[in-house]
C-alpha cells in the first residue's frame, strides 16, 4: 500500500472528522493524490479536509511576505544609517547583503536568539584577527571588527522596519507562527485535528509548532520510512526521521515499511559518455512502456538542467506527460538577450560613442528574440547591412542605418538608447521593448512569446521598487540587482498530474510513489547536491547552534531518494562521465550504496551496469576530405579558368587542392568578420597603402600604365627625407579609415602596439631606401607603383589549346640606370629558400611548391615582359620587417630570370593538366593546415 493510501486509511480508521481536519504536507504535488485516495476509500460523498503545504500554513495572514529584492533594498537603507556602512557603495553592500539576509532568515527559522548568535560570531571573527603583539589595527581591520559588532543592531532594525510595514520574511513568519500556534489551535473547534504527513528535514520552528499541537493531543505525525535505513544508526537517509520522532516524542502511527530488505527490483546503472546520452537513454526507456506503465512512471531529474532536452526528446508513443518542476527562465534565450542589452550599454560607456558597436549589432540581429518578430524582408536587409559592415570593416554602425522599417525603428531605438545610469529609464525601456516584441512575434514563435511574457511579468515588481527609489549604483551593480530579481522565475509546463509520465525534480516527489523510475543526472555533486552554504556563520558554530551544515544539507536528499525505492520495481539511473562537463564525473554515492550495501543484504535486487555512447551517423562518404570530379564540378573548374586568375590561386592549389576547391571552385571564400585587432594581412595592407601613396607621386606611370605628366624626375635624397616627414599623416589616415574613424581603437591598447610597429616599419624602410639611394651612381626612377597587370598564356590541356588569363598588381617597378626591378612587399619574414629556386628531379610542381615566392615573382616578370618587351633584370621580395636583409632576389643556381620564367610557363601547363584531369580527385594535402571548410 502506498503512503498516500495509508494516510487515507489512517484517517478512516481513526474516524477523524474530515470537516475538522487539516493535513499539512511538504509540497503541492501530494495534495491531489491524498484527495483522490480519500475519495476512493469512502463509498459516500465526503467533504474534503483542508490539505495545505507547511509553507502556506505557517504564513501569518496579517503580514504579506516581502520579496528578496525589497528585503535587499530595506537592509541597505537601514545599514546606511549606521556609521560603519555610511560610505559604502551599493556594489560593496551587495557583497554581503544577500548573505546576511539568509543568515537572518535561518536564525528566525531555527528560533535562535539573534543577539547571542551574532555575539558569538563577533567573538570568532575577533579571534581570527587577533594579534599576539600590541601593534595597532589598520583602518580596514577596525572596519572589519565594527561590521560584526553592528550585525545585532541591523537585525533588530530590520525586523522593526518589517513590523512597521506589515511585512515578513519566510523565517520571521515561521518564528511568529510558532509563538501564535496555541492561540491558532484554540481558535479552531475543540475537536480539530492536524496531520503532518511525509516530512523529512525540519527546522526547529516547524518541529516546535508540531510538538505544541501533539502535546495538546490534537495532532499526528506520519512518517514515510523503511527499516532498511532507520535501524542503521549512521545511514543518512534515516537520520532526520529518527531525530524528528525523538524531538516530538512520538512513535510511528503508520508502521515503518520492511520493503527494501526483501523486495524484488531491477536496477540498471548507465554510464553515458555525453550529457545528451542520458536523455537518449530516457527516450529509449519511455519508448518501451505500455500505456498502463506510463501512468506509473517517473522521470526523475537529479540534474534539473536536463529539463529542456528531456521535454524535447519525449517519444511520440507517450500519450500524456506532466512536467512539474518548470523550465528555469535562465535556461532560455532570455539570459543571453539580457546579457546583450547590458553589453550594449557597457560598450557605449567603453567607446564613448552613440554608434552601435558591430558585434553588439551582430548579436542583436541574429538573436532568436529579434528574429522572432522580424519579417523575411527585414532579415535580408539586416543581413545586407551586416555584410557591408564586414566588407568595409566598419566597427561602428549608425543607428539610423538599421532603422529599416517602422517596427525595427522602434525596436532599435529602445534597444540602443543610452540609459545614462538612469535605471528607471533602463527598466522602462526594457519593458516597453518586451511589449513591442511580444505584440509583433509571429505565430510560429509562440515559445519566444511565452518566455518574454514570463520575463516581463517578473519585472513588474522590480519596476515598482525602482519607482519608489533605489540607491545610487553603477551599471555592474544594477546588472547584479536586475538579474537577482528575474533569474529565479520558471516557465510552467501544462500537464495532467493524475495520468501519464511524470517528470519531476527530487523535491516534488515527496509522498508520491512510482513503479518505474528513470533517474537522470545521478552524478556525485548533483545527487546529493554539493552546493556551498552561503553564510557568515562558520560550520562549527552552525553545528553547535543546530543550524544545518553541509552534511545535513546533503543528507536530506538521501531520504528523498531511498523513499522512492519503497514501491519501485525498475530503476534506470544514468550519470555522465563526460570530462567537459562541470563537476565530478563519478556516479552518485547513492548508486554505490545500492551496489555495495543493498545488494549484499537483499539477494532479490538485480543490478546491471551499462555504458551508453550516442551513435554517430556515418558520413555519406568514407572520407570527407575527397571530392570526385563530377560533370558539375568540371563545369565549375572550367568557369573559374575562363576568368582571370591570380598567383595566389595557383599557390593555394599547390598548398592544398581541397582548399583551392572550396575557395575558388565552390566559391565559399573565407569566413569573414570585423577585425578590431589588426591581423597580419590587414597590418601589411595598411603599410603597403602608405608606401604606395609615398612613392606614387614620383612614378613615371600611373597604375594603369599611363604616362604621368609632367614626367617626374629621378628620385633624390630630398624626396626620401620628405617621405620621413609625410608618412606619419598618411599612415594615421590609413588606420583611421580602417577603424571607421574611431581613433581610440588604435591609439590605445593592443592596436596602439600595431600602430607603433607600423610607424617604425615604414620609417626603417624609407631609411633603408635612402641608404640604398646614396650608394647608386646612376639615376633611380620609380617606374610604377601598384601596377595593374594582365596577360594571357596559351597552354595545351589534354592535347587541346586553352587560353589562361592572369591578373595581378605589382607593388613597385623601379629602374636604376637601364636595369629594371619588379618588387613585391611582404610584411612577414622571408627565408632564403622562399626565393631560391631549385629544380628537384625535373618535377616542376614540387619545385615551384618548395620555392614559396617563385610563382608570384615569375608571373610578375611575365607581366613586366608583356608591358615592356623584355624580362626585368631582377624580381625581388622586399621584407619590410627585416631591413638588415630587405631585398630577396629570385634566383636559380647558374641560370637567369629568363630561365625561371620559361620553366614557369611549362609548370602552368602541368598544373592545369592536373586540375582538368577528370580521373583524379580533389584531396586534402596532409602536409597543409586545414582550412575552415576542411576541419
PLM regions and their residue ranges:
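Conserved helicase core region in the C-terminal RecA-like lobe
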Residues: 53, 193-202, 484-533, 561-579, ...
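Basic/charged alpha-beta structural segments of nucleotide/phosphate-handling enzymes
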Residues: 25-188, 204, 380-386
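Conserved helicase NTPase motor core
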Residues: 130-240, 271, 515-516, 687, ...
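Accessory helical subdomains and C-terminal extensions of nucleic-acid helicases
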Residues: 81-115, 136, 292-294, 314-321, ...
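Accessory/regulatory regions of helicases
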Residues: 358-363, 431, 523-644, 871-873, ...
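RecB-family 4Fe-4S metal-dependent nuclease core
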Residues: 518, 574, 581, 623-935
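Conserved motor-region signature of P-loop NTPase helicases/translocases
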Residues: 1-48, 54-56, 183-353, 512-513
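Accessory C-terminal helicase-associated subdomains
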Residues: 139-163, 190, 287, 401-508, ...
